[in-house]
Each structure stands twice: as C-alpha cells, then as structure tokens.
Amino acid sequence: IDDCELIVTSCIESLIIDDHFNPDISSLILNNSLISLKQIDIGNDCFKNVNQFVIDGLNELESLIIEEGSFTLDDENSRGSSCLIMNCDQLKQIHIGYWSFRWYESFELKNLPSLTSIHLDQYAWLKIVNEKTRKGSKCLIMNCDQLKDIHIGRGSFYWYESFELKNLPSLISIQLDRHAFMKCHRIVFESMNN
C-alpha cells in the first residue's frame, strides 16, 4: 500500500484479499494492466469507504467473489458511488455477499460475453433513502450474451430508481427475493431472449 494505491503486479493470476482489508483509498480500479488475472476473491468487511469500484478489460478474469459487508458506505459519502464491471471477455460468474455495496448508487455490468451467472446475497446494494435522494440510483445489466441466471437477494436495491436488463439473449431465469427492488421507480427489459 502506497498512501492511496493498491499495487498489484501484472503477472498474478489470483487476487485474494483477506477479511478486514481497509486501505485509505476512495477508489479501486482494476484494469487491463492486470493481463493475467483470472480470479478475484475479496473477503469480509473490506474496502470500507471506497466509493468507486471498477473492473475494466480484464480479459482473463473468470470469477469475481466478494464476501459479506465489503464496499460499504454511509449516507454522507455515497454521492456518485458506483460499481462498474465491464469488458471482461472470460468472466463467467459474479457472487456478491450479504450487506456488500451498502449505500452505493449504481451497479453496472456491461459487455461481459461469457458471463453465465450473477448471484447477489440479501441486502446487497441496500440504500435506504427516499423519493428525493434516490435520483440516479440504478442497476444496469447489458450486453451479456451468455447470461442465463440472475439471483438478487432479499432487500437488495431497495428504493433504487431503475432496474434495467438489456440485450441478454440467453437469459432463462431471474429470481428476485422478497423486497428486492422494493419501491423501484422503473423496470426495463429490452432485447431479451426470443
């Protein structure tokens, strides 16, 4: 750790972060400089106060697992917070644990051609807000040609403004547990399975 950077070499294949790893950083961006990375496994209660998490262009990445209570914010530092995962050709599965990404404003998955499964445990992306403060909050999943299953746990995305699924031609199953997207303002299904 160098003040505000997590330094990872380009030749590693697995990034495994133990529980309670909380460097003093506000953003975590993993991009195409990590050309060999195949697995990301982040433990419990990690990266508190990180308000921007981006994975972009990791073409060898196959699996992303984030355990319980990681990437959590509070109301005061949640403005503009986002989780963006895109342009990862080999990513097959995403599993996000209970109570992770609390107070985050957006979750976007884009251009993940090998992704087959998304599993979000209960209360992921929980944002207890009101009509006035939910503006811009969204869950967007698009351009994932092989995505078959989406499971979103209880209470996730509570009060979010929109839930959008676009261009998911292989989607077979969407399971939304109790209170998922409760009080969601807009739901869009576009260019889905024929």
Tell me what each language-model feature is:
Residues K38, N59-E62, N87-H95, N111-S117, ...:
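Tandem repeat domain/solenoid detector
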Residues D3-D74, G80:
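LRR N-terminal entry segment and analogous cap-like coil->beta motifs
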Residues I66-L84, L120-L140, V188:
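Acidic/polar low-complexity surface segments
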